[in-house]
């Protein structure tokens, strides 16, 4: 058992998310964020021998768990990488259309609670923050070279931090004296420059969130995968997404809204809306949030929102099909 496996992970909205997929015994499903396999194992329990489950994850520790599962269950295929490679990965596995795809966005509890990963200001550790520790630039490496303006924009846009400019200026001043290479060093700089405190929230929360999102390209990947899933879903197939903060939830909400209704017609158009093809998606029920009992058992579930869409027989607009090639 690796060190990360000693950290307790509670899958959020477990039954609700898998129920939303309406799993068919012979279906093909994708878990785009395997984590420690909570959603995947429940999907597998509902699949028959002819079913398949493809799981994605960037994190090498999560992939180790996924590969162990795949060795004991031949229905499982494993992809070590971000879900933005959705279509390319499915092509490589010889899979065409799928019956459903589930995404549990953001950071997992094992990643937060393993101090060595550098995601949390609760531990003094190397400032890494990469979900995939085998590739890419760490948070410390980026902070060492980013311009003050880039630091400000990332912290403001991805963390919605009011004091982003002051924090960016302080980072640039501090790194001129010594490297900012640990979580504690960064947290101390932020704390000294956030003038007002939010009740129950550490002053470093927004800055750490912002840098993590940027380093891992989290919002770009969400925006990239949604049209790919829409293109690959069978008619009646389901897309289920759990988001934990407003930035990623807004992307999902706007995407589903856009493709579940017709674009407004100009007044001069010689066609009625009723004569247009059916939109490619329809919203499947209202957005769901965890109940009081789940939040009491797992306070980190508090901000979760589950949105579900279903593929219709409607055609997919050409521009959406073109967008899917950008990440292939």
UniProtKB/Swiss-Prot annotation:
Q: Where in the cell?
A: Cytoplasm
Give binding positions for S-adenosyl-L-methionine: 37-39, 57, 83, 104, 111
Q: Which reaction does it catalyse?
A: cytidine(1402) in 16S rRNA + S-adenosyl-L-methionine = N(4)-methylcytidine(1402) in 16S rRNA + S-adenosyl-L-homocysteine + H(+)
Write one Gene Ontology MF term. rRNA (cytosine-N4-)-methyltransferase activity
Q: Tell me the GO BP annotations in alphabetical order.
A: rRNA base methylation
- One Pfam family in the UniProt entry: Methyltransf_5
Q: What is its EC number?
A: 2.1.1.199
Record's HAMAP family? Answer: 16SrRNA_methyltr_H
PANTHER family recorded? 12S RRNA N4-METHYLCYTIDINE METHYLTRANSFERASE, S-ADENOSYL-METHYLTRANSFERASE MRAW
Name the job this protein performs.
Answer: Specifically methylates the N4 position of cytidine in position 1402 (C1402) of 16S rRNA.
Question: This protein is called what?
Answer: Ribosomal RNA small subunit methyltransferase H
Its gene is rsmH
